[in-house]
Amino acid sequence: MAGPGSTGGQIGAAALAGGARSKVAPSVDFDHSCSDSVEYLTLNFGPFETVHRWRRLPPCDEFVGARRSKHTVVAYKDAIYVFGGDNGKTMLNDLLRFDVKDCSWCRAFTTGTPPAPRYHHSAVVYGSSMFVFGGYTGDIYSNSNLKNKNDLFEYKFATGQWTEWKIEGRLPVARSAHGATVYSDKLWIFAGYDGNARLNDMWTIGLQDRELTCWEEVAQSGEIPPSCCNFPVAVCRDKMFVFSGQSGAKITNNLFQFEFKDKTWTRIPTEHLLRGSPPPPQRRYGHTMVAFDRHLYVFGGAADNTLPNELHCYDVDFQTWEVVQPSSDSEVGGAEVPERACASEEVPTLTYEERVGFKKSRDVFGLDFGTTSAKQPTQPASELPSGRLFHAAAVISDAMYIFGGTVDNNIRSGEMYRFQFSCYPKCTLHEDYGRLWESRQFCDVEFVLGEKEECVQGHVAIVTARSRWLRRKITQARERLAQKLEQEAAPVPREAPGVAAGGARPPLLHVAIREAEARPFEVLMQFLYTDKIKYPRKGHVEDVLLIMDVYKLALSFQLCRLEQLCRQYIEASVDLQNVLVVCESAARLQLSQLKEHCLNFVVKESHFNQVIMMKEFERLSSPLIVEIVRRKQQPPPRTPLDQPVDIGTSLIQDMKAYLEGAGAEFCDITLLLDGHPRPAHKAILAARSSYFEAMFRSFMPEDGQVNISIGEMVPSRQAFESMLRYIYYGEVNMPPEDSLYLFAAPYYYGFYNNRLQAYCKQNLEMNVTVQNVLQILEAADKTQALDMKRHCLHIIVHQFTKVSKLPTLRSLSQQLLLDIIDSLASHISDKQCAELGADI
């Protein structure tokens, strides 16, 4: 950790050099042994593939392999292998190979006896082999010999040898349309269809030694998914995920995760209303799901008699869904090579409008880094895959490949599509503020709660940014304290609010809140810092009652976002065992909406008889019993139409407003940039930066002022504001010239990952234009970023006619003008030599 006054953390910029064909920023770890100077920054100037771009690759010709669905695909090295499926008339057992480098199809070499023709089987890769399990076999044309299988075959990629594994002992029931994955040297099989019913059992088998292995049934626990088939599974963060699928009347759009370690299932709750994010995908079957980085990507399937073609993305860390917006060049077709843009080929350098159209996605912001235009295809066609089901997907490197499937009118497809992922280090904003809350460092306010006068400490900056009600309370307490100090003739120093004489920590501000108890108030405070609460045990009466108390506080404090979260949790937790307790508590707390939910739950036909026979029912208050009986006798009230839900503001939105002026009166530290003061908030700086945390803990300046630099370099005021935006609310969008100043900031200031640096690097690689090249040249010269300076001079030389008309050119330093002249002279000399050589 970099201490105050030191040269700061150090960076390994060369290690950050990403692939030359993708805008995917690498998630690299800190290397504190390297130089923190951008002098050693290595950049890749293209060509790039646009993130979130769909490309249509060459389809599989009929003479190589039939169009198909219900097949499997796996990825091995630089190839996609397709096995089995059906072409609408017959089942298949051929093995096709697609080379992603040269975009060529062929039949894979095979020896031995392959599996019988089949579909709805599973295929996984382990080591240098592919394993095929189960599926449906027989003659679909004559409708004979149709049966499910439970056989296991191995295909060795190196030799092309097919081998059937003969397993002794218990076997899984024969099945098709199941899920399969590999984890910890084992094949895991879940659910499927056995010909009579859907399943939800799980089996596993070791793949290291077929002579010693056997099938084992897994004893699952927790919230096991319902019996289902035609669903995908994916492994991410050492967990297996299952989304939707065919479950008869029980079909849902729930996402389940399986912990391999303790064999436990959990249904993941959705909080899209709370987070202001899109809802989960519709319930569906026949779709695909793959994992990349910390995300799950769901595509296609049949969703309530439709075939949607949106790509849905689930963030495993933040538990949110979103619809991925394809890049604009996906929609207008590929430039130059719509069917041959594979890994081995050079992607043409496009202008900004042609390449990204400034259609900004969540993970990328892009401007032009190219200087030449590519010819437009004569007949542009959409590169987006149409909706389909029973297709298959696999991941190679940083891209997803989708092949085949059933499209409109039950037509089989032979198309191959490629989707470019994006990958950036995750935003740690919520975690950083949560860490501040847990540590209780630098607390400057103490809330005195309830009749017991229990105390909970916090930070004025966070609380006043998130809650107007608590902000008023804190303001009133400060005014009372100021009046008291004035009466005692001891005014608070004005030049450094929040800093006591000699740099000592000022006394805590005491705020009394009589209507709140400590435990629910702590849950509320956790929400203010993180935008979420740690999920209690679902259905446990004590936890449900606690969240009801939190809900009551959220209503009193006008925290709409917390209201929605509490309601979602409580309504999802109500069951036959706790409904009466929850209903009685809701009536006592005057929580009318929750009370209505409980009453409607009780009077359901399938619940009522069980509820009234419980002992808890006998102990209910008479008015509540009467209300339940009357509710049962009368038709339930008509449900009003859905009203817009006020989800309030998020942590990011509140901290943005706080930095932009809403928190001005609560500033308690002054940052000096080249002598210019910028008021700020200690708690926020300490939460996001180990540099400031160490300073405020052990080296607090006596005058409450901190000089700002990054190593020996003083950033521009614009770059400094960009850094503050990142610190306060995680903003990474900034002008490219700011990125040169801030590239080393994550190491010097001890940010908790390299997200800012990854975006700075991408920004520099992609966002230099003729319009901003001179500003970036100045920044590169000041920061001694030699690689970027050379690139800027290269652009200036090749676009000098346009650059010469920019007013900024006349304000450059003499030395930079001489550098431009030298580069022009060198370019002209090289050009003349080339022309002379051509003449000779």
Swiss-Prot record:
Limits of the BTB domain: 443-537, 667-736
Mutagenesis or variant effect for residue 654 to G: In SWN2; uncertain significance
Effect of residue 119 to C: In NS10; increased Ras signaling
Post-translational modification: Phosphorylated on tyrosine upon induction of apoptosis, leading to its degradation by the proteasome.
Start-end of each Kelch repeat: 79-128, 130-185, 187-238, 239-285, 295-341, 399-450
Outcome of mutating residue 187 to R: In SWN2; decreased binding to Ras
Keywords: Acetylation, Disease variant, Endosome, Golgi apparatus, Kelch repeat, Membrane, Phosphoprotein, Repeat, Ubl conjugation pathway
Xref: InterPro entries: BTB/POZ_dom, Kelch-typ_b-propeller, Kelch_1, LZTR1/Attractin, SKP1/BTB/POZ_sf
Pathway where this protein functions: Protein modification; protein ubiquitination
One annotated GO molecular function: small GTPase binding
Effect ascribed to mutating residue 528 to R: In SWN2; uncertain significance
Effect of residue 812 to P: In SWN2; decreased interaction with CUL3; impaired subcellular location; decreased ubiquitination of Ras
Impact upon substituting residue 217 to A: In NS2; uncertain significance; no effect on RAS-MAPK signaling; decreased stability
Outcome reported for the amino acid change (mutating residue 465 to E): In SWN2; uncertain significance
Signal peptide: none
Self-association and partners: Homodimer. Component of the BCR(LZTR1) E3 ubiquitin ligase complex, at least composed of CUL3, LZTR1 and RBX1. Interacts with Ras (K-Ras/KRAS, N-Ras/NRAS and H-Ras/HRAS). Interacts with RAF1. Interacts with SHOC2. Interacts with PPP1CB.
Associated disease: Glioma: Gliomas are benign or malignant central nervous system neoplasms derived from glial cells. They comprise astrocytomas and glioblastoma multiforme that are derived from astrocytes, oligodendrogliomas derived from oligodendrocytes and ependymomas derived from ependymocytes.
Name listed for the protein in its UniProt record: Leucine-zipper-like transcriptional regulator 1
Organism: Homo sapiens (Human)
